[in-house]
């Protein structure tokens, strides 16, 4: 079942989103322990209007677990959301690293899909596809964009099948 995220989903979503940051090899993930990062992500989902704020998230629930999620928002607010990271209770070493995603990727006239992630336990079941289709079909009047690692052939194929174009 696909539904909007709630604050109580924060622990499961944080663990999933951490997988993306780890794959992206972000500086903050290299320098700060997994436990501390997941704790901050949990807080960002509930306490501040960061990219990962729960109102920007839809989850795929299966067996009473968050099997996957998609994070999307108005692209014109991307950097405003990013600055909210600094409103978290950051320790000095984390503050010195800076915000996790300081470069603007979204265009102001687009709605930006920040992330689509499926739990390793549920991969290969079409969850990412269903999340993307749900988002696009329930918000068909929006112009959607996303970024993808060009080496991620499986994701690129999925995005192309759903009508996304390489720019």
Per-range role (PLM):
Residues 45-59, 76-80, 112:
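A short helix-loop-beta-strand connector motif used in the catalytic cores of GNAT acetyltransferases and
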């Amino acid at each position: 079942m696909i539904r909007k995220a709630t604050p109580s989903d924060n622990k499961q979503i944080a663990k999933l989103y951490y997988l993306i940051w780890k794959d992206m090899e972000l500086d903050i993930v290299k320098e700060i322990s997994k436990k501390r990062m997941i704790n901050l992500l949990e807080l960002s989902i509930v306490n501040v209007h960061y990219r990962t704020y729960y109102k920007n998230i839809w989850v795929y629930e299966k067996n009473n677990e968050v099997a996957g999620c998609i994070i999307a928002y108005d692209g014109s607010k991307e950097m405003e959301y990013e600055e909210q990271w600094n409103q978290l209770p950051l320790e000095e070493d984390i503050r010195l690293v800076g915000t996790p995603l300081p470069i603007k990727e979204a265009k102001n006239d687009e709605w930006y899909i920040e992330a689509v992630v499926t739990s390793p336990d549920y991969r290969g079941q079409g969850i990412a596809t269903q999340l993307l289709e749900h988002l696009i079909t329930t918000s068909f009047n929006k112009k959607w964009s996303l970024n993808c690692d060009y080496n991620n052939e499986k994701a690129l194929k999925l995005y192309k099948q759903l009508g996304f174009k390489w720019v």
